[in-house]
Amino acid sequence: MSDSKHVTYEDAGVDTAEGGRAVDAIKQMVKDTNRPEVIGGIGGFGGLFSAAALKDMEDPILISGTDGVGTKLVLAQIMDRHETVGQDLVAMCVNDILASGAEPLFFLDYVAIGHIEAEHMAKIIKGVADGCKLAGCALVGGEMAEHPGVMAPADYDLAGFTVGVVDRPKMLDPANVRPGDVILGLPSTGVHSNGYSLVRKVIGVDGIMPGTPEAAAKAEELSRPLEELGGASLADALLAPTRIYVKPILELLRNGANVHAIAHITGGGITENLNRALADDVDAVVTRNGAEMGWDVPPVITYVSRQAELAPNEACKTFNMGVGLCLIVAPEDEAAVTEALVALGEKPFRVGECVEGSGKVVYSDER
């Protein structure tokens, strides 16, 4: 090592000055997500959030969640469209804790990137901030990690973390689900943030590096309108941000709606998520007739499923099939909950019903 020359951090590929500019570019976005409980601003060693209001609860339970966006980011990078993947990140975390009836309080993000550019970073964090505002939670901190020599300059990955609270007497519990209960669904915007490893195979983007002529040609191809998608492009349909269901569902619960359980339909589709909201002695029977579900499926999910030649069972354990969130309610409460959801601007539909069983999801065309 004696013949080694002087090397700076910048020589190694880490641009701390550009990192500082990136922080300056996002400060106002972060501030705009603040709740009254937030103490101070970004730049400290930890995000501060007052818990004083929790004393008004009988037994406050803190619920945490963490997730990422997965390989949907590959498509965003090829298309050079980064403004909404942050909303995907927030949605994946806050919708998960919403399944327990929790209100998201605050959020933190982690961005690993090959090379930090302030303008690029601002686009990503704007999506995170927009998602936090949709969820009503504060963005109290985060990390931008530059990984030169490990990741390509334009390559990045995202992770998110949220903490929420629910009063124990109001916490949703799958143990409350009974045979005869009705399963209601709320529509997704499309694929949301799961199933993109399959999507990438179908649309032929595997192995394409962002910023290359090959990526530009593929981006042009994916931007063309398709008749099968009602004139939308594959890029638009596949990059539609994941819905955040927090505000309407919390309002529904605060208004006294009797909801037994909620399932966020993510990786594993209906088959491997709805079962997580069931009691051990209950099965969910989901309405299906062959490749047709009992509700409208977004055209992009139908398109990808057909291109991949997925059997109905494979599609249902890969994609959300147009259902972003499921609510399980007693049959006598179905009409009231449906009416309340409509009043909140939602478009609920019946997904199926619960029967005696062993905690599985089954389909009506297989019974």
Locate predicted features.
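Short, acidic (Asp/Glu-rich) active-site segment that either coordinates a divalent metal cofactor
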Residues: T66, D157, K170-G230, L234, ...
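Glycine-/charge-enriched secondary-structure boundary and capping motifs
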Residues: S2-D11, H120, I124-A138, M151-L158, ...
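Buried hydrophobic packing segments
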Residues: I26, L48, C93-V94, V199-V202, ...
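Residue-level signature of catalytic and energy-coupling elements of molecular machines
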Residues: D15, D67, G180, H264, ...
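Glycine-rich phosphate/pyrophosphate-binding loop regions near the starts of catalytic domains
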Residues: Q28-T189, V285
